[in-house]
From Swiss-Prot:
HAMAP family: GTPase_Der. Residues 30-193, 203-376 form the EngA-type G domain. GTP 1 binds at residues 36-43, 83-87, 145-148. This is GTPase Der. PROSITE patterns: G_ENGA (PS51712). GTPase that plays an essential role in the late steps of ribosome biogenesis. Residues 377-459 form the KH-like domain. The gene is der. GTP 2 binds at residues 209-216, 256-260, 321-324. One of its GO terms (biological process) is ribosome biogenesis. InterPro entries: AAA+_ATPase (IPR003593), G_ENGA (IPR031166), GTP-bd (IPR006073), GTPase_Der (IPR016484), KH_dom-like (IPR032859), KH_dom-like_a/b (IPR015946), P-loop_NTPase (IPR027417), Small_GTP-bd (IPR005225). Belongs to the TRAFAC class TrmE-Era-EngA-EngB-Septin-like GTPase superfamily. EngA (Der) GTPase family.
Length: 466
């Protein structure tokens, strides 16, 4: 294996399989969340930590984006840095939104960096976030950003008032003080993430979808009708997070149910608030039920939520809610919309339900079980390559640049979701990879789970001698 991930000889295969298997079994890296109000330099700090420009940075308050996680490495230690993004706030909604950001970070991170603008000083929003973080019991580091002079460093000292201990004066833009901050953060991190889901225990389910699609109603129907709520599991000092519900002779953990039960206010930025909640629930789940309003046209927001689930690699069940409101004409129109808008999701089990009346709600359990079984599936290397040989012989990859790439070998690098690596002599077009995914599903099932197909191109034999 070469430094850039290409490979040079068939003798590398066993080593590559071992390497991939080790990576798949590696314990989850600890997570550091970067939080703070808009325009304090969160994304700039994330980019500085990563050593590359990944997070969106714009010199205006509230570049509206979603929370994103990146793999990072510092002094030989792996960790994940979580950029909590920004929003377009107004004075009325800002404090609530920063507080929500902090509470999500408490649940999803092992340590938190609160970024404050040292030139502005502590604001009421900063104070609200600090109060929540202080109650978390997790390591919290105060980064006093935009410190580019001795005077600014003196201003940073005033941030002691937040009660988070000594402020760390930094300049995310120029790198000043960031190394010292990171050294302290990593010294406080556990070797293995303490917030990552542990194997075993009840399977974790998230109910997500656009506002007013019926998430709370479905949760109440599942819990109330079955009379089977075991208890609410205390998650943080802010609110209970998960609910354990017995369905189909097993207990399921429905994650972030506090977010479903609390109504989101009409303050500016509430869409970001909902997006943070959705990301948090998806990250914590193994299988995600995406609720879609069957009585109304599919929306861009529906598509965004579905994209979040696919990108996170979670098992997926589609629940078309409000079926009691759907007449025959709407059903025909909906089928056409699904064929047009969700053509890439034909693998996801679909259940037509009414959370209000309870129609077909019981069918969600077998759909979740099917999706999770697929999500957990591993295909042995022998059968996988026998299948691949037949498929490629019947439909070889298209010619690219006058040459036809050959697929020499395949292995499943991971499950949850099933992830495959193809070793080739050249690049494979996206269309051909989609074709292989369809054939994989035909041969091995995978109903209810995304599949990832990665390509590693073999290095030319003379490349390493040049």
């Amino acid at each position: 294996m070469t430094h850039d991930g290409t490979w040079s000889d068939e003798s590398d295969w066993e080593a590559v399989e071992f390497e991939l298997d080790e990576a798949a079994q590696a314990p989850p890296a600890p997570v550091v969340a970067v939080v703070g109000r808009p325009n304090v330099g969160k994304s700039t700090l994330v980019n500085r930590i990563l050593g590359r420009r990944e997070a969106v940075v714009q010199d205006v308050p509230g570049v509206t984006r979603d929370r994103v996680s990146y793999d990072a490495l510092w002094t030989g230690r792996r960790f994940v840095v979580q950029d909590t993004g920004g929003w377009e706030p107004d004075a009325k909604g800002l404090q609530q939104l920063v507080a929500e950001q902090a509470s999500v970070a408490m649940r999803t991170a092992d340590a938190v960096i609160l970024v404050v603008d040292a030139l502005v000083g502590a604001t009421t929003a900063d104070e609200a976030a600090a109060r929540i973080l202080l109650r978390s019991g997790k390591p919290v580091f105060l980064a006093a950003n935009k410190v580019d002079s001795d005077k600014a460093e003196a201003d940073a000292a005033m941030l002691w008032s937040l009660g988070l201990g000594e402020p760390h004066p930094i300049s995310a833009m120029h790198g000043r003080g960031v190394a010292d901050l990171l050294d302290e953060v990593l010294a406080a991190l556990p070797e293995v993430s303490e917030v990552a889901p542990r194997p075993g225990g009840p399977r974790r389910v998230a109910l997500v979808g656009k506002p007013n699609v019926g998430k709370s109603s479905l949760l109440n129907k599942l819990a109330g009708d079955q009379r089977s709520v075991v208890h609410d599991v205390a998650g943080t000092t802010v609110d209970p997070v998960d609910s354990l519900i017995e369905l189909g002779d097993r207990v399921w953990r429905f994650v972030d149910t506090a977010g479903l039960r609390r109504k989101v206010g009409q303050a500016s930025g509430h869409e970001f608030y909902a997006s943070v909640r959705t990301h948090s629930a998806i990250d914590a789940a193994e299988v995600v039920i995406v609720l879609i309003d069957a009585s109304a046209p599919l929306t861009e927001q529906d598509q965004r939520v579905l994209s979040m689930v696919i990108e996170a690699g979670r098992a997926l069940v589609l629940a078309f809610n409000k079926w009691d409101l759907v007449d025959e004409d709407r059903r025909e129109l909906l089928e056409r919309e699904i064929d047009r808008e969700l053509v890439q999701l034909r693998w996801a089990p679909r259940v037509n339900i009414s959370a209000k009346t309870g129609r077909a709600v019981a069918k969600l359990v077998p759909a979740m079980e099917t999706a999770l079984a697929s999500w957990d599936t591993r295909i042995a290397t022998g059968p996988l390559n026998s299948w691949l040989k037949e498929v490629v012989a019947a439909t070889p990859p298209p010619v690219r640049g006058g040459k036809q790439p050959r697929i020499l070998f395949a292995t499943q690098a991971a499950a949850r979701p099933p992830t495959f690596v193809l070793f080739t002599t050249g690049f494979l077009e996206a269309g051909y990879r989609r074709f292989l995914e369809r054939r994989l599903r035909e041969a091995f099932g995978f109903e209810g789970t995304p599949i990832r197909i990665n390509v590693r191109v073999r290095e030319k034999r003379g490349a390493r001698r040049r």
